[in-house]
Swiss-Prot record:
One of its GO terms (cellular component) is cytoplasm. This is Serine--tRNA ligase. Belongs to the class-II aminoacyl-tRNA synthetase family. Type-1 seryl-tRNA synthetase subfamily. Pfam families: Seryl_tRNA_N, tRNA-synt_2b. It is found in: Cytoplasm. It catalyses: tRNA(Ser) + L-serine + ATP = L-seryl-tRNA(Ser) + AMP + diphosphate + H(+); tRNA(Sec) + L-serine + ATP = L-seryl-tRNA(Sec) + AMP + diphosphate + H(+). Catalyzes the attachment of serine to tRNA(Ser). Is also able to aminoacylate tRNA(Sec) with serine, to form the misacylated tRNA L-seryl-tRNA(Sec), which will be further converted into selenocysteinyl-tRNA(Sec). The gene is serS. ATP binds at residues 261-263, 348-351.
Length: 423
């Protein structure tokens, strides 16, 4: 959520931001609500001043044994008016906050202006595409041929956009989770947490999924419970409504969770394979940091996510998301896109973002500098480290051999009993 004072003083700037983000949202209702709000506050202040002054007059009249009944009756009417205005103000402030929650974050000045993913510039690349002397297959064909992925039975159990992992498929998924967590905790210094996989609406509001993206979520019927769309939600909200000490920052957390998404609006996209599922596993990285270090921490976060792909020997590129493609809560985002030879394309495998104080303001996460009483909002960051299913996809497609087997990256073999290939 943006700061109210900033919104009030920068209407033109925010209008431009909304256009750059390709968002059809007028600030006129917010400006009108703010006008009403300030009018009521002024009137309440004047009435209270009048009431306080009248109280002194009433005291003087009583002391002088003069009639004060008319003034007392007038003040009763003033009190009734103040009560009515307070009720109006409560309603207006609720509408005001609801509208503020619909305004996305301001992009950082370094974010390129663009319409969609076609305008995302490539920031860097690592490695090279594998040289295959045969026609590469997509991962769903590889997995089904090896008997490690079963989409037909998954559809029988749950429906479309689910997968059943068999044998080495299940073992490979589990190995990747352990591998990622080990690197992030032992090499990168993150603290591992295992959060609830169900969250309430307050947590989703804090990280920005609600109210705008309600249709993307799975809600439990008749309960204020939602399945987590990403570990970002429960992990960021660990410190909701808390004030941390400066010495406690930065906070670095990593967590594995399954993620659940309705994929509303994705009809017809990626209907085969593991790329777009209702349920998938992900290892998440979350940071709570001081404002002045957040962009340095974003670059470190990106490197931490890249490290996983480098250890696995998978070719990838990093793109900077333009204004028209970036997420609602983000001030700046890098996407890591891994090369998939079976589909002859790059696909997102991690998204690393700095939200500045946007989420912290919504979730009320603050910190206090040493020797000061005043508190400030922390800056929050997160990134996938990585999406586990898509990493498995990349291993199958990049490691496929002409005989139909799949070579396991050496770094992952200790997690699989030193097996070198799946056949």
């Amino acid at each position: 959520m943006l700061d109210l004072r900033f919104v009030r003083d920068n209407v033109d700037k925010i209008d431009m931001m909304l256009r750059n983000r390709r968002m059809d949202l007028s600030l006129a209702p917010l400006i009108e609500l703010d006008t009403q709000r300030r009018r009521i506050l002024r009137e309440v202040e004047e009435l209270k001043f009048r009431r306080n002054k009248a109280s002194e007059e009433i005291s003087n009249l009583k002391r002088e044994k003069k009639d004060s009944s008319l003034l007392i009756e007038e003040m009763k009417e003033v009190s009734r008016r103040v009560k009515t205005l307070d009720q109006e103000l409560t309603v207006i402030e609720e509408h005001f906050r609801d509208f503020l929650l619909l305004i996305p974050n301001m992009p950082h000045e370094s974010v390129p202006v663009g319409a969609d993913e076609k305008d995302n510039p490539v920031a860097k690349t690592w490695g090279s595409k594998p040289e295959l002397d045969f026609e590469p297959k997509p991962h769903w064909e590889i997995g089904e041929a090896l008997g490690i992925l079963d989409f037909e039975r998954a559809a029988k159990i749950a429906g479309a956009r689910f997968a059943l992992y068999w044998k080495m498929g299940a073992a490979l998924e589990r190995a990747l989770i352990a591998f990622m967590l080990d690197i992030h905790t032992k090499r990168h210094g993150y603290t591992e947490v295992l959060p609830p996989f169900i969250v309430n609406s307050t947590s989703l509001l804090g990280t920005g999924q609600l109210p705008k993206f309600k249709e993307d979520l799975f809600k439990l019927e008749d309960r204020d419970f939602y399945l987590v769309p990403t570990a970002e939600v429960p992990v960021t909200n660990i410190h909701m409504n808390e004030t941390l000490e400066e010495s406690e920052l930065p906070k670095l957390y990593t967590a594995f969770t399954p993620c659940f998404r309705s994929e509303a609006g994705s009809y017809g996209k990626d209907t085969r394979g593991l790329i777009r599922q209702h349920q998938f596993n992900k290892v998440e990285l979350v940071k709570l940091v001081k404002p002045e270090s957040s962009y340095e921490e974003l670059e470190k976060l990106l490197l931490d996510a890249e490290r996983i792909l480098q250890e696995l020997g998978l070719h990838y590129r990093v793109v900077t998301l333009c204004t028209g493609d970036m997420g609602f809560s983000s001030a700046k985002t890098y996407d890591i896109e891994v090369w998939l030879p079976g589909q002859n394309t790059y696909r997102e495998i991690s998204s690393c973002s700095n939200f500045e104080d946007f989420q912290a303001r919504r979730a009320n996460i603050r910190f206090r500098r040493k020797g000061q009483s005043k508190t400030e909002f922390v800056h929050t960051l997160n990134g996938s480290g990585l999406a586990v299913g898509r990493t498995l996809v990349a291993i199958l497609e990049n490691g496929q051999q002409a005989d139909g087997s799949v070579s396991i990256p050496p770094a992952l073999r200790p997690y699989l009993g030193n097996i070198e290939r799946i056949d």
